[in-house]
Amino acid sequence: MQKDSGPLMPLHYFGFGYAALVATGGIIGYAKAGSVPSLAAGLFFGGLAGLGAYQLSQDPRNVWVFLATSGTLAGIMGMRFYNSGKFMPAGLIAGASLLMVAKVGISLLSSPHP
């Protein structure tokens, strides 16, 4: 007989999609321009975002890795977008990061505290 471990939390699909977008951006930057720093940063931040999304799917209050990752990327890529004026890739990642910060922040503020 299998023991019931309670309800499972749903996967954080938006978070995993965001992590895939960030990692894919790094891979594309490497493929198009041969930029090793772009590859390293994309895989690093994509991995952190994936870890944060996994943590969110396990406990919706465990937002700190995901929030720090998306907030850092919003700041870095927002400055790159401001300085270059190019939407791809800096504007896209900055916008997606801001949306993720807003989504997680709103869900954190609106959830009941134990």
From Swiss-Prot:
The keyword Transmembrane helix applies. Keywords: Heme biosynthesis, Membrane, Mitochondrion, Transmembrane, Transmembrane helix. Its main location: mitochondrion. The chain crosses the membrane at residues 8-28, 33-53, 63-83, 89-109. GO terms for biological process: erythrocyte differentiation; heme biosynthetic process; mitochondrial transport; regulation of heme biosynthetic process. Pfam families: Tmemb_14. GO terms for molecular function: transmembrane transporter activity. InterPro entries: TMEM14 (IPR005349), TMEM14_sf (IPR044890). It is a multi-pass membrane protein. GO terms for cellular component: mitochondrial inner membrane; mitochondrion. It is found in: Mitochondrion membrane. Disulfide bonds: none annotated. Required for normal heme biosynthesis. Belongs to the TMEM14 family. This is Transmembrane protein 14C. The gene is Tmem14c.
